[in-house]
Amino acid sequence: MNDFPDPLSQLYCKFGRTVEMAQVMEFEAGNFALALISVMFDPEKINNEQRRMFKSVIDDVDKRTFGNLLNLIRKRVSISEEIEETVSQALEKRNYLIHRFFKKHNFAIHSEEGRHAMNIELDDIYRTINLAHAVLSAMTHTLNQAFGWPNISQEETLELIRKAKTG
């Protein structure tokens, strides 16, 4: 059941797709933060206290905003200026998308020209956020490879912790 005119549906679809990419990027920042912390553990010698601490860290990462995660990462590692700029631009555009995009365009959504401008802007925001996601993903993968950790998702990490508790 779609009561929106087709061009409006397309705009909302593009907005949703861009917001989804922002969430994927945030999730990858969390994966990188967890990868940074995981290098402190030897998976062959992890004890229950370390498991609880790691679970606590995962819970903390889940509650952080993207900006807070970036600050956590910046405290732990030195990041090149190019990467810093890429990720900072994505953070800025993510915040604009979530908090100000529709407010800025206000009545523009009601005209073809306005929707066109909004679509162009959403494409730009998507590209910026997608690039930051790719950079964060590559950083996570590289860190995991450097320390011999498998590249697994947060869900897989939680499952390993659950298995270790019951195993």
What are these regions (language model features)?
Residues 1-8, 70-78, 112-113:
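Short, charged/polar, low-complexity loop and linker segments
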Residues 1-64, 88, 138-160:
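Amphipathic alpha-helical interface elements
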Residues 7, 14, 79, 83-86, ...:
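Residue-level recognition of alpha-helical structural elements
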Residues 10, 17, 82, 86-89, ...:
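Alpha-helical initiation/capping and key positions within long helical/coiled-coil segments
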Residues 26-29, 91-94, 98-101, 126-129, ...:
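A structural signal for well-ordered alpha-helices, especially hydrophobic packing surfaces
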Residues 37-88, 92, 96, 100-107:
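Flexible secondary-structure boundary motifs
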